[in-house]
Amino acid sequence: MHEKRTRLIKKCNMKSGPLMYWMSRDQRAKDNWALLFTQDLAVKYNLPVIVVFCLVPQFLGATTRQYSFMLEGLKEVEKALAEKNISFFLITGLPGKKIPEFVEKHTVGALVTDFSPLRIKREWKKEIVQKIDIPCYEVDAHNIVPCWTASPKQEYGAYTFRPKIHRALPEFLENYPTLKKHPVTWKEKKGKADWKKSMLTLEIDQTVPPVDWLKPGEKFAQKTLRTFLKN
């Protein structure tokens, strides 16, 4: 994994608890640099890995349709992680409050999260970093060229930005390693999400129902992509 894909956003001494990946933007078990980085770091220190997703009561006008689609996909993530000996936890509330509480309660050793340019995620991250006293890493698991290395300044337009991306592609185009079955089990608690109860915590528009013509989950997403590339 390219070292420029990761940055340390809080420097502290690591604790002895599990390494925690706060999954947010990149909701998948496969081809996820943030998850792979967390596992590599955990293997280095012989520690367990846990993945936590914080379900917020409302998000930028999302309705039952969007939340239902997302949660069905996360069910698939939970199952895939269990096969790799990694516990998945679904917690509810605002990340700025709930993530630090989880970190303290379970003596988390270090925190890893995926990068998002949205202001709301940056505000959550800032609040969390201020409250925790463990190392915190941010990994760009979304872009081929990490956002913070793409350009040192605000670009005028695509015509000035595109050449920089093209020059950086050979450096960052690399194959994903396979997520391994994690060798260290977290014996304290096994994650088991209560999906129905979590849905009841949402403060969203319930009048927009889920659709049945589009299937959620990373497996179907990969199948759709392969079909598109083939045809």
PLM region descriptions:
Residues 1-176, 180:
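Trp/Phe/Arg-rich N-terminal binding region typifying the photolyase-homology
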Residues 154-231:
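Glycine/tryptophan-enriched, flexible segments
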